[in-house]
Amino acid sequence: MKEADIHAHIFPEKLAEKASHSIGSFYGVSIEREADMPRLCAEDKLAGITRCVVSNSATNASQVQNANTFLAEAVRGHDGYLAFGTIYPGMDGFEEELDRMLELGLRGIKIHPDFQKLAIDDERGIETYKAIARRDLPVLFHMGDDRYDFSSPERLTNLLRRVPELRAVAAHFGGWRSWPRSLAHLQPEGVLYDT
């Protein structure tokens, strides 16, 4: 049987240790390994994973281009690996960056509202999501951190009412630490979930 992982994070090797530590601190967990491409490939092989989507999330607009270039280069030459790029919703030049992402071969987009400190349904991002939908790119949303109100299931439902053609994937089964809310509110047709 072929196994797939659609939610793996990687960072440039010089940043992987710091990024892994920062993410662990943010969530109050211990991350034992650095999140870089060589380690991911080795561990995927041991686990029998043959397809993998890698991503990371820019925390501000100034990080977007470098992150997308890195992700495209990281998966080049690795059969079975695809990259989802990142965008900061509402950033200047989002149309051009979305086109560049397609030219780079990126296959979707990862949004982390809690790291970006911008609610999924924030008005500033609506035109960005419409542009993403026009390009038929799926968006993997980090979902449901109950410490904040940026990534609630209700907010994704609100966004999909405004941009119903958006292909949304709700990470962490639709609501990291808020699954009951996800089950109650995140019912739009066409939403996919990662588990």
Model-assigned labels for residue ranges:
Residues R107-G108, D121-T195:
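Catalytic pocket-lining loop regions of alpha/beta-barrel enzymes
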Residues A35-C41, N66-L71, G93-E96, P153-L156, ...:
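Alpha-helical scaffolding within the catalytic cores
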Residues T50-R51, T59-L140, D145-R147, L192:
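Active-site gating/metal-coordination segments in enzymes
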Residues M1-S62:
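An N-terminally biased module of ancient metal coordination in phosphate/nucleic-acid-related enzymes
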Residues K2-F11, K45, D99-M101, T128, ...:
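A generic "structured core" feature
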